[in-house]
Regions:
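Acidic, Ser/Thr/Gly/Pro-rich intrinsically disordered interaction regions
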Residues: 2-38, 45-211
Length: 211
């Protein structure tokens, strides 16, 4: 008999969910956070296969070269495109790489940041690598993730758009319609770049407006 059958896990789960609401994370927040993490994961895993396509290198019976690539390098490679693709297609990939960089920074702050709670009636935020207690010399980047309206919707849209793009890139040399599909995504990818940049730099933008 599985051990969870003798433990009231539904009640415990609901208790934890209630405790999270007391931190200001309402059900909609948790749903959209989950949706964003899934969509970003779809982009991230499909990106690897898209890079195999762009490199035109076989990975059969060899360790994929992407396995040891730093995240920043994967975005750089995406942005470089491929000389066999059209100028319009490569231009879309270049913008997508910049969007991915901003969105990845937001994702890291959300997943790895400290939750800053102001009580059940206020929306919390997340702070990554803060300089608390007089600490200095951190080599990891500082970051913020805000989940106020409309930021969660914006990052979900951006992540989904990037996934659609790399899904098309993966088959760009086998599907005769893929390149045209990529070109047609220009507006969506421009929008993803705008959204991702806004959420990544929201703290700086807010401080600038105050000044």
């Amino acid at each position: 008999m599985p051990p969870y059958t003798t433990y009231n896990y539904p009640a415990k789960s609901h208790e934890i969910q209630y405790r999270l609401t007391q931190l200001g994370l309402q059900p909609k927040h948790m749903m959209l956070i989950g949706g964003f993490i899934v969509a970003y994961g779809m982009f991230e895993t499909t990106l690897e296969r898209a890079l195999w396509t762009l490199s035109e290198r076989s990975i059969e019976q060899v360790r994929p070269f992407t396995e040891t690539m730093p995240t920043a390098e994967t975005f750089k490679m995406l942005g470089a495109g491929n000389q066999k693709l059209s100028e319009k297609c490569n231009a879309v990939l270049k913008v997508a790489a910049r969007a991915a960089e901003d969105l990845n920074d937001y994702r890291n702050s959300l997943v790895h940041g400290y939750i800053l709670s102001f009580g059940p009636n206020d929306v919390p935020s997340f702070l990554r690598n803060p300089h608390w207690h007089g600490a200095t010399g951190r080599k990891k980047a500082h970051g913020d993730a805000f989940i106020d309206e409309p930021f969660q919707d914006l990052v979900l849209i951006a992540a989904w758009s990037l996934w659609r793009l790399v899904h098309a890139v993966e088959k760009v040399f086998t599907d005769p319609e893929a390149q045209a599909d990529i070109e047609s995504m220009k507006d969506d990818i421009d929008r993803a770049k705008s959204y991702a940049g806004e959420v990544r730099h929201q703290a700086a933008l807010a401080n600038h407006e105050k000044n």
